[in-house]
């Protein structure tokens, strides 16, 4: 779990920005969104193959 220590006199906006960077870097929100709903294995497989096809077409 990322944490940020706010120093005396440091703006809260800066601390929030640092926290957001840490959360993005660790992929916490992405993982939470992925586990929001259950996806059947067939749906996951279909999405994976679709993403691979999109990547190959570039």
Swiss-Prot record:
Keywords: Ribonucleoprotein, Ribosomal protein. It comes from the Bacteria. One of its GO terms (molecular function) is structural constituent of ribosome. One of its GO terms (cellular component) is ribosome. InterPro entries: Ribosomal_bS21, Ribosomal_bS21_sf. GO terms for biological process: translation. The keyword ATP-binding does not apply. Residues 43-58 have a biased composition (Basic residues). Residues 39-58 are annotated as: Disordered. Pfam families: Ribosomal_S21. Belongs to the bacterial ribosomal protein bS21 family. This is Small ribosomal subunit protein bS21.
């Amino acid at each position: 779990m990322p944490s940020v220590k706010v120093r005396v006199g440091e703006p809260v906006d800066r601390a929030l920005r640092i926290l957001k960077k840490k959360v993005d870097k660790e992929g916490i929100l992405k993982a939470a969104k992925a586990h929001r709903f259950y996806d059947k294995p067939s749906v996951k497989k279909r999405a994976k193959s679709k993403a691979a096809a999109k990547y190959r077409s570039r």
